Amino acid sequence: AIFFVAKKNGKSTLSSGIGLYCLTSDGEGGAEIYSIAKVKDQAKIVWQEAVHMVKKSPALRARLRTTINGIFYDRNDALFAALASETNSLDGKNPFVVLADEIWAWVGMNLLNMMEDGMSAREQPILLETSTMGDVREKVFDNEYDYSSKVIKGYINEPGGIVDETILPIIYE
């Protein structure tokens, strides 16, 4: 899914909730949920929001273990952590859910491509790209935005539209 929305409309909260739901309720053994961004501080915003949700919920606190490195669901050997393109150890990841934040700031596709490659072993992987329109857009955002716009046009049979049932683009302008 691709979700573009203006600032301060709850992107991080939405992503965090989806990540926690998939961590605990989807039944995926060894689930790896990653909040990713260009830099670690940005990736940690979604993850930290999830940590706050766990701390505020007695039900989640009883099921999950939080550390400085991640949120763990031991019953399913599942993990929710933050990663960034500046991280050196991205190979070997087996993500079930990838929460890609603020793609307007991304310069290249390397991190996203590595996550998508890692998802190939999963039966029902989820990639959620969220972003504001940003200040200086780079290649990744423009490519995703253009493709999403064409898919939306395809759903409503407009000229220039394409049909791709593997993504759900949502653009609020």
Predicted regions and their residues:
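Phosphate/NTP-binding elements of NTP-utilizing enzymes
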Residues: 1-173
